[in-house]
């Protein structure tokens, strides 16, 4: 028998009801996580006929085929029915549709969240085209910032939904808020484990930029480049995430954590990633219009590349990798030419600060 002592902060929290706004693959996967922690989980989807189909088949045949929904998960197209009684609210609506949702349907929901002080977990990734804002910033226009936290990290929907071991970060400006949500979202079987952080900016930047970089990784794969090139892209891309995070005032602690390096490595390395798949097709010569026309799922990196470049320009942050990916997606630049331009940048210092201080009296042994 284990003799390990558990403090109060280690004890998991269980709720009566949770609501997930956003019925895509990831929203459904998070509903499956919450089904282990709540008596009732409600998932909002705007199309009433599709809601009926999902509830009848007990499977999200639209976005997550093959995963049987837990018995305590219900889909609904009624916003008020969805949130009524909820003790936690998750937003997984695509970034470009978030503002429209609040403006059209958010009135009573906003009042409910404020009155009940319901914690809101932002799980959407990207940058809004019209304002260059991240998802938590958009929602922060409608709900008080102290209610908002961010979930980010390496988490393919199919693995989350089927209980394959997953670790993510939950970020809040108040570490105690993050720790409470950590106890709500982490499951008793430890298949879904959350780590708390205060770097909300780093989590949102990393979550958005990694999707653009994953397109680049896919392009390199489509061009027949190897794993060495992928590793270089991941590392240099991580520094672009670091620089943008710094420019936006983040403390950077999330950049080399689960939300940063962890999610970037995953998204850039697997065809389970929609963004990687889009990039691979671009690398093989398919036009972006055809790729998007034949794909049901949203590849957030495509929508993010343009506002990302405008934001970087505004902040005077150099992001050469992301710039070339933008050129491929939006300017129809030949992927091989984009690669050649990257390689012609000349020899440079690596640009990483030392991690350890060494006194002059202690010379290196190497």
From Swiss-Prot:
It comes from the Eukaryota. The keyword NAD applies. It is found in: Glycosome. InterPro entries: 6-PGluconate_DH-like_C_sf (IPR008927), 6PGD_dom2 (IPR013328), G3P_DH_NAD-dep (IPR006168), G3P_DH_NAD-dep_C (IPR006109), G3P_DH_NAD-dep_N (IPR011128), NAD(P)-bd_dom_sf (IPR036291). This is Glycerol-3-phosphate dehydrogenase [NAD(+)], glycosomal. A motif (Microbody targeting signal) lies at residues 364-366. Homodimer. GO terms for molecular function: glycerol-3-phosphate dehydrogenase (NAD+) activity; NAD binding. One of its GO terms (cellular component) is cytosol. Its main location: other.
